[in-house]
């Protein structure tokens, strides 16, 4: 099984930013002067001691495999090529930022169902807009956002009120929060159980601490405690906000608030469910994920949904097609670039390295409205931007689910 996983992960399933460009290198293997439009070696991100995502180092070499060119998209994209100094076993490939006229923080969706305060966020209302999602797997091209299509003049958000309350409040409509996640793997046991810190980015390089999360050491499944107090990551801490828990296979993650399951007076609420598509047959490509959120009321408050005490939670509602109070999001389909031999997405300068973790969340009715985007900028630093209807806690938990190992998904 270990050899199978190594061979499968040797293929380039990473997602790069399409708005980046590098000086084209010459391959060390190719010595006839011909330029190559791909990574200089496979991305064996589970087999290198220098790999930024590696927790338990392992040794051995995996055979080099190639991914056939996909004819899915013919959209013009900018070229990305790796640095000649990169290790061929690293998952990440640094790229240089090009000046971008359309930045992520300047986009704002113009659809009434997302920016009109009187409209609730629910699939019943969203689906009435007649939007369609173009999936590259079906042979159709993915539509690209433009300044006219995605709007403009989003306000950059800031912390309002006590941090314990702000992190669970849905983002106001028309406000963009630009955050950074730092992974701390220093210390005796942080190689296995790193601590993740969420900061809200401010002007002039300043940042405001928001949340911290860490996987519990003694748990049958992946279980992350998320708190506003970075010094006490426990359920008993005053800063405890909620938790992220996975199933046995690591394919489904549940986000709960700080309530207790057995407390009938104040039951634990479902705040999100993250579902990763299984990949048992070993198909190559980036991860596919579905995110379920509680619906929004007309005054922009979340509908209370709880799976405690046998009630129908988010996942049960989704399985039974009862979507009246559930919002369903999907990762935006990356486009295969023949020239770089990789999948690309336009992160508008916020993501600078290729990674299988990079993603953007959209609703099928309007793929131009980026609800959340997450991606790598260095070995242990990631950017996380989110909008309405997400809150900081929900977005942070969704990002943490991307860090966790998924044997059946890769």
UniProtKB/Swiss-Prot annotation:
Biased composition range(s): Polar residues: 48-72
Biased composition (Basic and acidic residues): 132-143
Region (Disordered): 48-109, 121-159
Principal location class: cytoplasm
GO CC annotation: cilium; cytoplasm; nucleus
Gene Ontology BP, a term: protein localization to cilium
Keyword Cytoplasm: yes
Record keywords: Cytoplasm, Nucleus
Keyword Cytoplasm assigned: yes
Location relative to the cell: Cytoplasm; Nucleus
InterPro entries assigned: Tubby-like_C, Tubby_C, Tubby_C_CS
Family that this chain belongs to: Belongs to the TUB family.
Name of this chain's protein: Protein king tubby 2
